[in-house]
Amino acid sequence: LSGRLSIRARLLSLDKDLQGELVLDYYEDGFVVCEEGLIVEVLSADDYFAKMPSGVSYEDLRPYLLVPGFIDNHVHMPQQDIIAGRSSELLDWLDRHAFPAELRYADHDFARIKAATFVDQLLSAGTTCAQVFSTVHGHACESLFVAASAKKMCLVAGKVMMDRNAPVDLLQNAADCRDDTERLIAKWHGRGRLSYALTPRFAVTSTEEQLSLCSDLLRRHPDLYVQTHISENLQEIDTVRALFPRQRDYLEVYEH
């Protein structure tokens, strides 16, 4: 958005009182005033008209309720086409649905189109901020950042890191993984409203070498985010126990 925009609607939002506690604000008739795409003021209709000259135009959305955008703190870009894919266990579901969907992102044009569609789907549902798993492909994560940047969306994302227990075309050795990740961090982390998250998928698909790589990258870039999965079902937990017999529990796999 460019220029100045005033929106009239019923408003609901969270704010902080003088003690710093969150309080719920509600205006039966209120205004949100934006300049150059940023909210600069939220106020009642009475206060708005008291300070604005007569005849100033605004967009009237009454009787609709205007609320802050939603935040999705865990979502996978390539799973937009496999929603509700059924399976009895997580590992079987990955083999049947998730991995085949992710293999398609090897195609650069496909990844670019799907990244743009994914961002549009989030925004159309009122989700204005998300933490996203991309795929193992560096160009797919790049396309995601490009699409989010074009819409000035707040996004935390990272390329998925896997080096075992997945289709061979979704595996990446440590050197290539480091190069792709460092390039994405340098280009996108802290750019606009974008941030990078180190993204080892989960312990089943990462060797100790790859997890050590994540630790090293985090030491080099301590302001990065980290996202993964843990303890989603019993079969997965048993598999992790077999792969990492020296660790006392699932969480210690990531901590050590």
What is the role of each PLM region?
Residues 1-53, 64-66:
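N-terminal metal-binding scaffold of metallo-dependent hydrolase/deaminase domains
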Residues 2-3, 54-56, 62, 125-128, ...:
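Short coil/turn connectors at secondary-structure junctions
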Residues 32, 37, 63, 74, ...:
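Divalent metal-coordination and catalytic microenvironments
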Residues 33, 83-153, 176-190:
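Alpha-helical scaffold segments that flank or form the walls of functional sites
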Residues 66-108, 228-243, 253-255:
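N-terminal-biased segments
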Residues 139-256:
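Metal-coordinating catalytic core of metallo-dependent amide/deamination hydrolases
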